[in-house]
């Protein structure tokens, strides 16, 4: 359990990820009306995001071994966290199956599909940065079970966010932005907020 608590301290800012969970739930709304179901969804979405974050970090352990405060790159800690990851995935599917078997099946296939993608593409550097972002549109899909172009918009929005926020993320069209405004750390978050507000407004027009 010590390895888990240390991992959470190093890699999972609960306050920040709670905000991400709330944002994703808001994006899943068909109209701007919040029910108790949406409130109850927050812990589940947060747990899912934690599980996927852990999955990605363990996949990146070899690459991140030179980085500071990355205890999950230690072989002993990594094995402990791999066990925790498997347990977390089983718990996620079990919780969802208790309430909705269709959603549980969708989650199971997503986890399998995501693992296959990591196995095939993670070592191809141009794909490595994009794979962890698949979890965001999936959260919205699992909440409302409606495939739509909105899922693509959410994925693209998080790609842009990462381009703005992460200096290691492929630059593409934002090279000039990063060179001109290197210290504007608030801009990526303002972009996500603007995207969220735009989506809410469009759904209620």
Feature locations, PLM:
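Multi-pass alpha-helical membrane architecture of UbiA-family
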Residues: 1-205
């Amino acid at each position: 359990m010590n390895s888990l608590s240390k991992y959470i301290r190093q890699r999972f800012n609960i306050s920040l990820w709670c905000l991400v969970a709330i944002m994703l739930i808001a994006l899943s709304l068909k109209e701007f009306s919040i029910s108790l179901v949406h409130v109850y969804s927050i812990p589940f979405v947060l747990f899912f995001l934690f599980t996927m974050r852990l999955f990605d970090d363990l996949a990146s352990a070899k690459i991140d071994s030179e980085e500071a405060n990355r205890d999950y790159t230690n072989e002993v800690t990594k094995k402990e966290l791999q066990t925790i990851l498997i347990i977390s995935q089983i718990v996620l599917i079990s919780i969802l199956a208790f309430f909705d078997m269709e959603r549980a099946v969708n989650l199971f296939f997503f986890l399998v599909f995501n693992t296959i993608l990591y196995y095939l593409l993670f070592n191809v550097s141009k794909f490595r940065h994009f794979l962890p972002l698949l979890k965001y549109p999936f959260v919205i899909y699992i909440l409302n079970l409606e495939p739509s172009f909105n899922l693509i918009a959410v994925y693209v929005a998080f790609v842009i966010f990462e381009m703005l926020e992460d200096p290691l993320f492929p630059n593409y069209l934002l090279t000039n932005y990063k060179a001109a405004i290197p210290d504007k750390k608030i801009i990526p978050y303002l972009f996500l907020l603007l995207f969220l507000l735009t989506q809410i407004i469009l759904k209620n027009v």
